[in-house]
Amino acid sequence: MLFPLQVAAVTSSVRDDPLEHCVSPRTRARSPEICKMADNLDEFIEEQKARLAEDKAELESDPPYMEMKGKLSAKLSENSKILISMAKENIPPNSQQTRGSLGIDYGLSLPLGEDYERKKHKLKEELRQDYRRYLTQGITQGKRKKNFLSTSETDPSTLGVSLPIGERLSAKERLKLERNKEYNQFLRGKEESSEKFRQVEKSTEPKSQRNKKPIGQVKPDLTSQIQTSCENSEGPRKDVLTPSEAYEELLNQRRLEEDRYRQLDDEIELRNRRIIKKANEEVGISNLKHQRFASKAGIPDRRFHRFNEDRVFDRRYHRPDQDPEVSEEMDERFRYESDFDRRLSRVYTNDRMHRNKRGNMPPMEHDGDVIEQSNIRISSAENKSAPDNETSKSANQDTCSPFAGMLFGGEDRELIQRRKEKYRLELLEQMAEQQRNKRREKDLELRVAASGAQDPEKSPDRLKQFSVAPRHFEEMIPPERPRIAFQTPLPPLSAPSVPPIPSVHPVPSQNEDLRSGLSSALGEMVSPRIAPLPPPPLLPPLATNYRTPYDDAYYFYGSRNTFDPSLAYYGSGMMGVQPAAYVSAPVTHQLAQPVVNTVGQNELKITSDQVINSGLIFEDKPKPSKQSLQSYQEALQQQIREREERRKKEREEKEEYEAKLEAEMRTYNPWGKGGGGAPLRDAKGNLITDLNRMHRQNIDAYHNPDARTYEDKRAVVSLDPNLATSNAENLEDAANKSSGHMQTQSSPFARGNVFGEPPTELQIKQQELYKNFLRFQIEEKKQREEAERERLRIAEEKEERRLAEQRARIQQEYEEEQEKKREKEEEQRLKNEEHIRLAEERQKEAERKKKEEEEKYNLQLQHYCERDNLIGEETKHMRQPSPIVPALQNKIASKLQRPPSVDSIIRSFIHESSMSRAQSPPVPARKNQLRAEEEKKNVIMELSEMRKQLRSEERRLQERLLHMDSDDEIPIRKKERNPMDIFDMARHRLQAPVRRQSPKGLDAATFQNVHDFNELKDRDSETRVDLKFMYLDPPRDHHTLEIQQQALLREQQKRLNRIKMQEGAKVDLDAIPSAKVREQRMPRDDTSDFLKNSLLESDSAFIGAYGETYPAIEDDVLPPPSQLPSARERRRNKWKGLDIDSSRPNVAPDGLSLKSISSVNVDELRVRNEERMRRLNEFHNKPINTDDESSLVDPDDIMKHIGDDGSNSVATEPWLRPGTSETLKRFMAEQLNQEQQQIPGKPGTFTWQGLSTAHG
């Protein structure tokens, strides 16, 4: 039940005075939370006090205790104070203890013996341990797991259960662990150094005790300390204490009581070990302590290994007077007070370099005053400076006084309130500073927080990029503890028995002020960067009760750069420089060093030398004694030896650590650990086993038990390719690895081989079986791949054959189609050739018949000419002609001229052709010349056909002239002529106008004409029947109407011609030749009608076969009125049947060539020619009666023809239209030129242009 009392007392202490509870900035932050718990625990504290009062009553009533009745009440009250103050301060049990601090020896002053006290303390310790285990039972495992992960160790409780899974701690956890580790190391050093000094002091008899008491009255150490403390407290007291001084004394008393109480737990054990340590003090206490640490049953070996590693990482915090292994002696129960919050244990140790000088010093007299040195420590719970000697004396006097707690009043409460407020402000500043540091670390993305330079995840040079490498010349001196100004120190005493000479200014607290200087505050913590610097100018003298607000943690971290990446920056060799404590001290005193782990032969000499060398007490002698110099030299040599040993050990540990890192690097698996769902891989990252395939094989084995043999082999085969490694390699790897790191194998046999044993025969056999099975699998896989490749090859060949056959079939079909196409083309070509041949034969037959007819016609013409000559001669003799009318003189002269014969025409044509050929430009193509030469042969035949057509036209015109009045207007459509030749337009890049038929509908007049023509065509008549046979469809527009009207007129004219030919024998023989001559020379409006009705709707210039060019066609081609026959002549011709000049009707245009296929119908031409020949024969055989003109005309047809106005019918059938072939045009142009040459004075006579090219 003691431990809950401690917790409650701590809470109460924090509430009363939080400055006394501060250990570090982190514990300051926790203090508000603890203050909140204080109100709830007040009742619990009162109950504990009542229980203690009951115990007191029982002890008083007990007979063995009645012997000490006079002292029991005081002691028991002081014991209660000790318990409460210990719980408040929570001072570690091995903290510093002074010889004359408290005059109470709890438990040892009873007459029950040492066995009773030993059992009592043992029971108390067991109760504490049980209660602590109860509190930390559920959380210790998780915290230990984090500790294992942070130190890269393996939890032994998880061995054989599962593979360790590497977890990463957060930055906050790593920071906390690193801080705890650093401060624990610091506290352990302080504890061990203080323990060493206490052991030396216990072995030394105080000088004041010898002076006041005889030797026979000396009692055991603890009893003598109590009596000495009480005797020292009875010394005279010159000063009157103020409330502040009383408060300071009370605090000192509490601290001393707590140190005393903490020591009681280990007092029996220390008493047993004291004699052994005395004998082994000179040799070294580290070996014995190491053995004691190793012999502890509560701490496992694995934890001991971790302590070694921590020492390696925290080497920079070692002190020159600190043994490397002393820190391991600290018991594990002092590390943490409670594992549920991992709070830093209040283990307050002191590792200052002059700690051995601050033990229980013998009292020195100054003017009758007893000067006693008390053990003043730097407490992280009160942030106090070293108290002065007067305060210590008053505290020692109050130790035996029950009224010590009643010396301060309202003024002390105000001071406590001010300190609390100051403490609260400091906490707020620290919290703000911590937030700023976190924000800066986050902004700069630093990987170093407050975890120090030993973070295993960060490289030593990680801060170079931020230019934060340590710069010694820029660093500032850490804060110093305040001190009172002092005079120049005097040289120390040569002998401790000589009384000191009083100083010039006898200040009672001079020695304490000297101890509170720079050497006292920073001697063991300040790094060597401030060693050669003198202290700053001294401040004015301070009051004796002045308290600094800083604690040990402030001075500890203030003198160190936690972000320094260099390990050597805080090496053990650099931390042992003693700073200059005084400005005016001699050089010999500034080099004073503490005595570490050395025990002289004379205890009194050692103690006095420690006091002298510490520089805390000065004497009047100017030179030290030989003994002090000798001890100083021995201390220096001892320090040099220890430093060399320490460096050697550090080198060994560094080599061991590097070897361990190399071993870890060799065993590092970049692919991660297998198992737990992760695939098993070899060193190269390849999968060792395929779990999916194994699962399928298991299913197949369940359904097919016959194949179970292969599955059994797979199940027992080792999967670890590293089992065949040699035994030496396994041993070497196991030696290089840390004991906390477990080497996990990716094999099912790894659990039996975790310590590097060589593989057994069974494992080797299984490995061979596995290798054979792997080879079997490889062969089987190769066979499957080969079979697959063969199957693919066969499939590809089959596909290629199919494609080849398909290509051949397509090619054959294509060739067949091409052959069929060629056959069709050949057949079509043969058919065309046959048609052409037949057409040529028919053409030749027609030409032969034409030649025969032409011959017959020539004979007839010759016969007619002869008859005309005979008739002319007869008429000359019979009567004289009437006088010629002047208007008809030119016409008559033209009538008297003989028409040219066929031979003359041919000769003139050849002549003109030769002349035009000589003058023709080299424009025409060769083909036109060849074609013209071939066409020359057919010119005569064409002329004969033209004569027949002229004869029929002549008769038609004669009939019309008889029935027309002289004042009838001849409507002639004129066409605008393009004044520019077509080639000139092409040369000037002009577009020739094209006349197209208007798309408009029929007007009323045209529609009426069509209707009347249809009625006329339906009448029964021979000519109309032929017209219906030729034109089956009725006319639809003006153009077709003109064509059919012209055809009807032509048929009627044929009928009239036949009638006239029947009565041709009766006509005068001169009428026919004169009429034919006039017909041949009759001027015609050839150009106007040709261009007006031609299908070629543009004015074009044409080039002849021999290169001649046609002249421009004139629009004014109508004969003058003088050339028109008069009414008298028309009446005369009517009665005499003479042909007179008159305007000829319009001729339908013809845009087709003479020998075009569309205009030549061989069968129709043959029938018509036969009909003409028949009529011609009848005309020759039957005599013509020229006097009876009525026999030549059909009265009905004449009357019907008169009623029809054919002036608008200017079109004709294509084969009856005027010739438009180039040959006829050229021939007519030649004829025109020839006629103009013969009769220059008569232009425009005898033109062949515009004649019909019909073959009928």
UniProtKB/Swiss-Prot annotation:
Biological processes per GO annotation: positive regulation of cell division; positive regulation of cytokinesis
PTM comment text: Phosphorylated. Phosphorylation increases in colcemide-treated cells.
The keyword Amino-acid biosynthesis appears for this protein: no
Keywords on record: Cell projection, Ciliopathy, Coiled coil, Cytoplasm, Cytoskeleton, Joubert syndrome, Microtubule, Phosphoprotein
Entry-annotated residues carrying Phosphoserine: 244, 459, 527, 901, 920, 966
Biased composition (Polar residues): 222-232, 736-748, 1246-1256
InterPro entries given in the database record: CSPP1
Entry comment describing in which tissues the protein is expressed: Expressed in adult and fetal brain with enrichment in the cerebellum. Detected in testis.
Coiled-coil intervals: 38-62, 114-135, 244-270, 417-449, 625-669, 925-964
Region of interest (Disordered), ranges: 189-244, 381-403, 735-757, 813-853, 913-932, 1114-1147, 1232-1256
UniProt feature, compositional bias: Basic and acidic residues: 189-208
Pfam families: CSPP1_C
Localisation per UniProt entry: Cytoplasm, Cytoskeleton, Microtubule organizing center, Centrosome; Cytoplasm, Cytoskeleton, Spindle; Cytoplasm, Cytoskeleton, Spindle pole; Cell projection, Cilium
Any one cellular-component term (Gene Ontology): spindle
Disease as annotated in the protein's UniProt record: Joubert syndrome 21: A disorder presenting with cerebellar ataxia, oculomotor apraxia, hypotonia, neonatal breathing abnormalities and psychomotor delay. Neuroradiologically, it is characterized by cerebellar vermian hypoplasia/aplasia, thickened and reoriented superior cerebellar peduncles, and an abnormally large interpeduncular fossa, giving the appearance of a molar tooth on transaxial slices (molar tooth sign). Additional variable features include retinal dystrophy, renal disease, liver fibrosis, and polydactyly.
Subunit structure: Interacts with PLEKHG6. Interacts with ARMC9, TOGARAM1, CCDC66, CEP104 and CEP290.
Protein task: May play a role in cell-cycle-dependent microtubule organization.
Protein name: Centrosome and spindle pole-associated protein 1
